[in-house]
Amino acid sequence: DMNEVGVINEIARGESIYAARFVGKYVYFITYRQTDPLFVADISNPTAPKLLGELEVSGFSEYLHMWDDTHVLGIGYGDSQQSKIKLTMFDVSDPTKPVEVNQKLIDSSESWSNEFVYNYKAILADPEKNLIGFTANDYYLFSYDSENGFSLLEQQALTYKNTEGYRGIYKDNDCLLYTSPSPRRILS
């Protein structure tokens, strides 16, 4: 049995949490319904969590990943119609004032087939190798730097339009797109 030990009231009333990431004494979370804020809360005292900051952004993230000590990567949608995939980088160096420092929108005339919206294992997010990969009709592989933002390294057409089961993995210096029965090299 789980017991509630602390609560933060009166935030994002009527909205749903779409993504959350717990890192040390902080939790970062995204809600969605009318507005799409990123919230930062201090959970160092579990019985008295405190909301520290929030930032309203367009779109919403389905996945959050701590990129480095001061940045959180978000992957989701750039609009409420879910017609654009959005990569976003948040600067959370000041938890009371999170800032969206970069974003990249991917548009498609087709509806999206994205396993990452319900399976976080479908995302390759590796700050050390500077790789961000996921399926969204095709397999996309990006890098990130603070000056240039997100850079598309590779867009690989998928053999099957059902994106389930495709994984970006790396071995040594090769990035592979893996699916049964055999992997394909997409970046060396």
Label for each model-derived stretch:
Residues 178-188:
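Single conserved hydrophobic/aromatic residue that forms the stacking wall/gate
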Residues 25-31, 71-77, 130-136, 168-169, ...:
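Short beta-strand elements that form the blades of beta-propeller/WD-repeat-like
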Residues 35-39, 82-88, 138-142, 188:
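Structural motif
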Residues 43-46, 90-97, 142-150:
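Short loop/turn segments immediately following beta-strands, especially the blade-tip
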Residues 4-7, 46-54, 96-104, 109, ...:
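Blade-edge beta-strand/turn elements of extracellular beta-propeller
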Residues 56-62, 102-120, 152-169:
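Conserved blade-ending motifs and adjacent loop-strand segments that build the rim/top face
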Residues 74, 84, 115-145:
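Loop/turn-rich, solvent-exposed surfaces of beta-rich toroidal or solenoidal domains
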Residues 19-21, 65-66, 117-128, 168-171:
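Structural signature of eukaryotic scaffold interfaces centered on beta-propeller domains
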